[in-house]
Amino acid sequence: MAETSSLISGVAQRCAGSLFELALDANSVASVEKDLGRFEALLSGSEDLRRLISSPVFSSEDQLHAIGAIADKAGIKGLVGNFLRVVAQNRRLFALPGIIAAFRQIAAEHRGEISADVVSAHELTSAQQNELKATLKGVAGKDVTINVTVDPSILGGLIVKMGSRQIDTSLRTKLSSLKLALKEVG
């Protein structure tokens, strides 16, 4: 499984790097990032679309036509629309979530930012997000872009992943640590 994950990661990095170079040449990094975000929202909202990109059962022609129709309907044209079609034609749709994440990371590095993945038990308000960004900026010494994911199973607190560092202040982790400590005592 680790080999498959690194393979996807390698494909994602190469594809994202190529897309970034094209976007940089066209002076459209921000619009490409926005279009990728719109496609990612479609992806997260549709089980059928996730199945289409991950299943080897669909032919490349079927994937190409479906992705083209979805991109057109969503108004994703130009560089990202063409890129999605090429990825579908080359049977690399399975790597799209990784490509989008890698593109964001490359674009953030180009802007001198660092990206942080934040998991919280509930939606963070704008004020909470701004306070978190300011705190993380103090730690990292760079502007920080946060990608917030809601996971009610952590019960409370936050899990922040920034580069190779992870800060886990979730209630779930604290309860697990307490449970382990009580087992050692008893």
UniProtKB/Swiss-Prot annotation:
UniProt-recorded name of the protein = ATP synthase subunit delta
- Subunit relationships: F-type ATPases have 2 components, F(1) - the catalytic core - and F(0) - the membrane proton channel. F(1) has five subunits: alpha(3), beta(3), gamma(1), delta(1), epsilon(1). F(0) has three main subunits: a(1), b(2) and c(10-14). The alpha and beta chains form an alternating ring which encloses part of the gamma chain. F(1) is attached to F(0) by a central stalk formed by the gamma and epsilon chains, while a peripheral stalk is formed by the delta and b chains.
Query: What membrane topology is given?
Result: Peripheral membrane protein
**Family note:** Belongs to the ATPase delta chain family.
Q: Name one GO cellular component term.
A: plasma membrane
Q: Which Pfam families match?
A: OSCP
Where does the record say this protein resides?
A: Cell inner membrane
**Per its database record, what is this protein's job?**
F(1)F(0) ATP synthase produces ATP from ADP in the presence of a proton or sodium gradient. F-type ATPases consist of two structural domains, F(1) containing the extramembraneous catalytic core and F(0) containing the membrane proton channel, linked together by a central stalk and a peripheral stalk. During catalysis, ATP synthesis in the catalytic domain of F(1) is coupled via a rotary mechanism of the central stalk subunits to proton translocation. This protein is part of the stalk that links CF(0) to CF(1). It either transmits conformational changes from CF(0) to CF(1) or is implicated in proton conduction.
| SUPFAM superfamilies per record | N-terminal domain of the delta subunit of the F1F0-ATP synthase
One annotated GO molecular function = proton-transporting ATP synthase activity, rotational mechanism
**Any idea which UniProt keywords this protein has?**
ATP synthesis, Cell inner membrane, Cell membrane, CF(1), Hydrogen ion transport, Ion transport, Membrane, Transport
